[in-house]
Amino acid sequence: MAVQQNKSTRSKRGMRRSHHALRSVTISVDRTSGETHRRHCVTFDGFYRGRKMIEK
């Protein structure tokens, strides 16, 4: 089992965790339906970049 040789400081711990923060999701509005959706994802209606991608 790995055991640290010296105590890590609060500063080093914080620097290591600096990339752990959650980022907000970017939301776009579809040109055709006006529906909001995540970037680079198909809307619930099946539209992506103004075109029908999925037939229901």
From Swiss-Prot:
Q: Which UniProt keywords apply?
A: Ribonucleoprotein, Ribosomal protein
What are the protein's GO molecular function terms?
Answer: structural constituent of ribosome
Q: Which domain of life is it from?
A: Bacteria
Q: Could you tell me the Gene Ontology terms of the biological process aspect for this record?
A: translation
Gene Ontology cellular-component annotations: large ribosomal subunit
- Family listed: Belongs to the bacterial ribosomal protein bL32 family.
Quote the protein name from its UniProt record.
Answer: Large ribosomal subunit protein bL32
Give the organism the record lists. Blochmanniella pennsylvanica (strain BPEN)
